[in-house]
From Swiss-Prot:
This is Large ribosomal subunit protein uL15. GO terms for biological process: translation. NCBIfam families: rplO_bact (TIGR01071). GO terms for molecular function: rRNA binding; structural constituent of ribosome. It comes from Methylobacterium radiotolerans (strain ATCC 27329 / DSM 1819 / JCM 2831 / NBRC 15690 / NCIMB 10815 / 0-1). HAMAP family: Ribosomal_uL15 (MF_01341).
Amino acid sequence: MKLNQISDNPGATKDRMRVGRGIGSGKGKTAGRGVKGQKARTGVAIKGFEGGQMPLHRRLPKRGFNNLYAQDLNEVNLGRIQEAVDAGKLDKAATVTVESLVAAGIIARPRDGVKLLGVGELTAKLSFEVTRASKSAVEAVEKAGGSVSVVYAQGASTRGGSEAATA
């Protein structure tokens, strides 16, 4: 067998129907569009147009707003951190920061920081520097003998810099 001899089985592929190419083709003249009217013309179907009826996107009320100051935080559970420690991706002695979480592959990118959540079990004694932490996460870390310091992440600090002011 050679690459230039490979072909589909007979009848496996069907040629595309070219419309509007003469009456004898079976799809000539109106090309399967019927006769006249808006749908027979080009540039048909105005998106969202419902024939004069009030369209759905205008019948439904506007709702909510986009908060310009909302923080886009990575949510990390204690269980994931314990798995990383067990796998040797996180150093027990070092402080767990946004940068170390990215390096360990727990989060993909820094975004606006990290919120520590208390789902899962933590047995390793770790110290954390995170943007936010839930009460249950702080309790679980302290129960394991570690500590949590909430660091307000500002622009450069989440993007690899080292400017972090403790709150």
